Amino acid sequence: MSSKLLTIQLLEELVHAAELNQEGKTADYIPELANVNQELTAIAVQALGEKTLAYSNNPLHPVTLQSTGKMIPLIGLLEEFGADQLFEWVKVEPSGDDFASITRLEQFGPKPSNPMLNAGAIALCSRIPGIGEQQFRWLEHWVQKLFNQRLSINPLVFASEKRTGNRNRALAYLLKSRNNLGADVHETLDLYFALCSYEAMLDQMLYLPTLLANRGKDPDTGEQILSTETCKITLAIMATCGLYDETGTHMVKTGMPAKSGVSGYTIAVVPGKAGIVVLSPRVNAKGNSIRGEIMLEGLSKAMNWHFALP
């Protein structure tokens, strides 16, 4: 199957095709997320060895990571402690349940099913080394490493997460009751809410998926930032668990390992070829960006980037 050239015109076509879909809405259960422009639709692609291309239908502004931030403790702990230790804290199996499922943890715990679920990310946050401020410095260190720059925490979103995060509190206390939380509940949740509340511009989101696409090497300098083993494990988890109970549908349509967030960001990886980020805050009931998926499917078809196609 022949592929198109990767051009700004192609990205513009993908955005305009996605704009036709009016389904979904902003995630209003985190009040600050409801205040964004729900028509914002954007895409950026970094093909290895080529310049970054991006297109947006509206002026861009910083958007919080939300669940794309779950990549931070996963990758950081993999690098520092290794896979064997990480898998003592969390499993790597698709759950078939929504991202904040309590039932799944009750029935199949004490280990959360995978690091992409809220319970899994909370469990990993409790394993961040240090106490208090040391743990926040650990987060800052890994944000710097995985985004190639510092990011800021949006204080309004952080406060909103803390104020409304009762389901996450329930998950944390359930983990604690099963002896699978490595630290204090409140301190762990502060870390979790913080990583969800980091905010980034579209172009700032592109470094991490491009790093993973390039086997852990900085796409500009060639410096080995992450081990190839960490990249392999991370991409496998993204491919099987990155969009919760919609991951199978996503992989059938796009063939790209990806990680979504309810803010509207989805990062995707074409191993050996490209890093991608799409943005649209119109999300479905599963917490995934509807227009984002339309853009990723269109890009995959246009570029012949589905993993299952030769």
Swiss-Prot record:
EC number: 3.5.1.2
Keyword entries, A-Z: Hydrolase
One Pfam family from the record: Glutaminase
GO MF annotations in UniProt: glutaminase activity
NCBIfam families: Gln_ase
Organism lineage: Bacteria, Pseudomonadati, Pseudomonadota, Gammaproteobacteria, Legionellales
Identification of the protein by name: Glutaminase
UniProt-listed InterPro entries: Beta-lactam/transpept-like, Glutaminase
Gene behind the chain: glsA
Self-association state and partner proteins as the record states: Homotetramer.
Enzyme class, UniProt record, top EC level: hydrolase
